[in-house]
């Protein structure tokens, strides 16, 4: 292979060991891309690329609809969702569909409707994808200039960015409208153990909403993941939706400033790397949210958080031993600290034992037993309700651990129910996907910057030093 760039397109080139390999009538010399970079053939074919994106959306929506119906078909109303390995129905239940007090599923028909709507949508998207990939115009610039683009056209790219931002803003407002006007959403903090309610008193104070962003990510602070009431969550979506829509309008109406034109790389691969970087951040944040937050991800549907299961076990044994006559306020544990209750470093009364590390847990079954200085001893003696006992015993035995030994004091038993928490699945999958997206971001950012700088990492195999060296044998 004689050139390190394509004579026809001036794109960065993959350097193959075998530069003469031709597949489907394409070879590296004429296209500038190796056989495995299949998407590269669509770089300048906006119509075909549209088809690929629409078809991909169809696959995503088809999976959502099919998996939704699969979960509905296998759903057992008598068991909690998190015991059935469900990952889609918990999201629908959190939005207030089909559930009542305590998160009990009253009606699965809304879930069926959701699955069917997604399947129908996927058929429309699939048809559109096949049409644009096979039958429609290869390029859109001539026939449909509004939908056409050139990757280097900075103004067009920011217009497309603006359209995307407006669509994201509309999505944020869909949640707001559902919570305000269309039946409400599930609130795990509703009195008596959770219920569906309309959110009437939105938090719109910027100091509260943006205060979450300024909090430390550690300990009892917990950054945005620490949000624990729906007024703040829905109010945050009002702010987010407004910012996205206003930012979208701004990007449609303006051209990039000089500093942005200089600082950013303006190529298709650069935009891919920016998108992968953003998705990576989303994945890591979602991982933390589903692992720690029991308001946006109610434990009634997703199972308890790790700290919640640990605190639930301490509470369950406190209830048991108190009934057997133990004085839970003064009993000493094996380390000399309180066996059931102790004080945190700042003086609050907290659960003793290994679960002390999770003393800043907030959960709707536990908060009614707190006073101004942490857990209230008189409430623990007189005010514990049966629903709190039932829920804590249930959460104690459904920790999202996947471990054979004790973690955070939670007794795990290898002969127990065959159980993997949806929290474990969702947190792990989003972390792993976030990581791979980050690697993809670095890869494509490096290639895009190299191409913009006028070079491409790689060795011309015709003159590779190893070719002139003595064979190993």
Curated annotation (Swiss-Prot):
<feature type="modified residue" description="N-acetylthreonine">
    <location>
        <position position="15"/>
    </location>
</feature>
<feature type="transmembrane region" description="Helical">
    <location>
        <begin position="291"/>
        <end position="312"/>
    </location>
</feature>
<keyword id="KW-0007">Acetylation</keyword>
<feature type="modified residue" description="Phosphothreonine">
    <location>
        <position position="15"/>
    </location>
</feature>
<keyword id="KW-0604">Photosystem II</keyword>
<feature type="transmembrane region" description="Helical">
    <location>
        <begin position="447"/>
        <end position="471"/>
    </location>
</feature>
<feature type="transmembrane region" description="Helical">
    <location>
        <begin position="134"/>
        <end position="155"/>
    </location>
</feature>
<keyword id="KW-0472">Membrane</keyword>
<keyword id="KW-0157">Chromophore</keyword>
<feature type="binding site">
    <location>
        <position position="367"/>
    </location>
    <ligand>
        <name>[CaMn4O5] cluster</name>
    </ligand>
</feature>
<feature type="transmembrane region" description="Helical">
    <location>
        <begin position="178"/>
        <end position="200"/>
    </location>
</feature>
<comment type="subunit">
    <text>PSII is composed of 1 copy each of membrane proteins PsbA, PsbB, PsbC, PsbD, PsbE, PsbF, PsbH, PsbI, PsbJ, PsbK, PsbL, PsbM, PsbT, PsbX, PsbY, PsbZ, Psb30/Ycf12, at least 3 peripheral proteins of the oxygen-evolving complex and a large number of cofactors. It forms dimeric complexes.</text>
</comment>
<keyword id="KW-0597">Phosphoprotein</keyword>
<dbReference type="GO" id="GO:0009535">
    <property type="term" value="C:chloroplast thylakoid membrane"/>
</dbReference>
<dbReference type="GO" id="GO:0009772">
    <property type="term" value="P:photosynthetic electron transport in photosystem II"/>
</dbReference>
<dbReference type="Pfam" id="PF00421">
    <property type="entry name" value="PSII"/>
</dbReference>
<keyword id="KW-0934">Plastid</keyword>
<comment type="function">
    <text>One of the components of the core complex of photosystem II (PSII). It binds chlorophyll and helps catalyze the primary light-induced photochemical processes of PSII. PSII is a light-driven water:plastoquinone oxidoreductase, using light energy to abstract electrons from H(2)O, generating O(2) and a proton gradient subsequently used for ATP formation.</text>
</comment>
<feature type="transmembrane region" description="Helical">
    <location>
        <begin position="69"/>
        <end position="93"/>
    </location>
</feature>
<protein>
    <recommendedName>
        <fullName>Photosystem II CP43 reaction center protein</fullName>
    </recommendedName>
</protein>
<dbReference type="InterPro" id="IPR000932">
    <property type="entry name" value="PS_antenna-like"/>
</dbReference>
<keyword id="KW-0602">Photosynthesis</keyword>
<keyword id="KW-0793">Thylakoid</keyword>
<feature type="propeptide">
    <location>
        <begin position="1"/>
        <end position="14"/>
    </location>
</feature>
<keyword id="KW-0812">Transmembrane</keyword>
<dbReference type="InterPro" id="IPR044900">
    <property type="entry name" value="PSII_PsbC_sf"/>
</dbReference>
<dbReference type="GO" id="GO:0045156">
    <property type="term" value="F:electron transporter, transferring electrons within the cyclic electron transport pathway of photosynthesis activity"/>
</dbReference>
<keyword id="KW-1133">Transmembrane helix</keyword>
<dbReference type="GO" id="GO:0009523">
    <property type="term" value="C:photosystem II"/>
</dbReference>
<dbReference type="GO" id="GO:0046872">
    <property type="term" value="F:metal ion binding"/>
</dbReference>
<dbReference type="InterPro" id="IPR005869">
    <property type="entry name" value="PSII_PsbC"/>
</dbReference>
<feature type="transmembrane region" description="Helical">
    <location>
        <begin position="255"/>
        <end position="275"/>
    </location>
</feature>
<comment type="similarity">
    <text>Belongs to the PsbB/PsbC family. PsbC subfamily.</text>
</comment>
<dbReference type="GO" id="GO:0016168">
    <property type="term" value="F:chlorophyll binding"/>
</dbReference>
<keyword id="KW-0464">Manganese</keyword>
<dbReference type="InterPro" id="IPR036001">
    <property type="entry name" value="PS_II_antenna-like_sf"/>
</dbReference>
<keyword id="KW-0479">Metal-binding</keyword>
<keyword id="KW-0150">Chloroplast</keyword>
<keyword id="KW-0148">Chlorophyll</keyword>
